[in-house]
Every structure is written in structure tokens, then in C-alpha cells.
């Protein structure tokens, strides 16, 4: 075979290898990403939009403006929704049904020193991407029954919010989001996952599953089980092979799993990876 032909053949093999779907622990393949999102240097929470098909919601971590970003699955920012509130340590965003239809819940629950007397959860009607803003948020001041905790993960089912602490126990706390102008709601401990440092949790778009992530795995639970305190997962996906700079967010829509990461020194843009997974029914 001529040298030129060998070079062409080798180049074609290399290109095919580079463009191949990347397998993640068997059940998942990367179908897009990592996409680089310059406005999300500290992408923290992630949620699948219920009102805008094909879009995700995310936000930056502490020290940033109170803005929700609508992204498509390639990482392009399609909308920016500012909220008229002050941020302390935003850690998560969740999408769920509410009395007015579909709502977004922002969890200002970060507490690295476990010293905050109260944390805050904000609820707003989920806007259409064409809307420049949404209604003023409802504010839920909250405490834990056993004192302050650092947490980065929250999911919402009906009128109840569930917070998972960022410690070895990964304890789950539950409270009903009842507005009150004069007193805080109290989160009660209902169980623990024992996963270590949980950075995000979210219900699937159809509401049947809850996905919880750490730096090295995404763990799936049946929603009906988890809200009753049954903490046995039905599926686990290893994700540490993706080499995210600092993996943070997770969202699930059918068989699509989405992961977000903060940027790294020298390239501050956040990352978004989309995976297609073969999940048990």
C-alpha cells in the first residue's frame, strides 16, 4: 500500500475514533458536549424545563447576579431571567408542578460553615423563553429541625421540598412549602442516602424518578419510594470518566441525562454534557 494511502487510512481511523460516542460505564453514551457556556462560569443547579421543550434551566453559584439561564442541550443560552432578589449562596434550581401550573424553585441553601440561621427557597412561575421576566418570587424562609446544614441539592414533589445535605450521610430533609410572612418553615429529617458529597438532585421530567449526583456517579431512585423514606436506588451510573472540571448539576428527561460543571482555571466557561442512557423501566 502506498505511503499516502496508509496516511489517509490512518487519518480516517483516527477521525472515526475521535468522533465515536463515548461510553460511560456501559448504559450511557455521550451524544453531545462538553459544550462551553461562558456566562455560566459556576453552573450549579440544573433542571429540565417543563414549559419549554428541549431547554434546561441553570444558574451561577454564590457571588453572582440573581439570573436564571435557559439553555438548549448544546449549551446555547436562549434566555436570561433576572429575579429581583439578593443572592447569598444559590445552589440548585428545580422544575415542578405548582398550583399555578409549572414553577421553578431556586434553593439558596449553601452554608459552608453551617452557620446560617435560615436558608431561602424562591418559587416563580416558569416563564416562556420569549418572556423577558417572570412574576415576583414567593419567598420561603426555612430552618432545619436539628440546626444548620450545608447543602447543594434540592428537588420538589407537589408542594413538598426535599433537601439533601452535602456530607457523608447525605441526609434528606422534607418540608411543605406553605407561605408565611411571620415564621419560617422547618425541614424534618426523613432519611439518609449515604452517598457522600451530593451536589445536585432533581426529579425526572415525568416525575417518576429522582436523580442524585456526586462527583463520580448519578444515582436514580423511584420518586414514590424516596418520598416515603425508602432510600434504595434502582440504578447507578458512573460518570467520573467524563473528567469534568468540577461536576455540579444533573437533570433527567426520559433516557437523556444532562450534567453541568463549573469551569476550570484558564477556561472559566461552564460545561454541559448530554448522555443517552439505557435505563430500566
Positions of predicted regions on the chain:
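Sequence/structural signature of beta-propeller domains
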Residues: 3, 13-281
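N-terminal Sec-pathway targeting helices
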Residues: 1-7
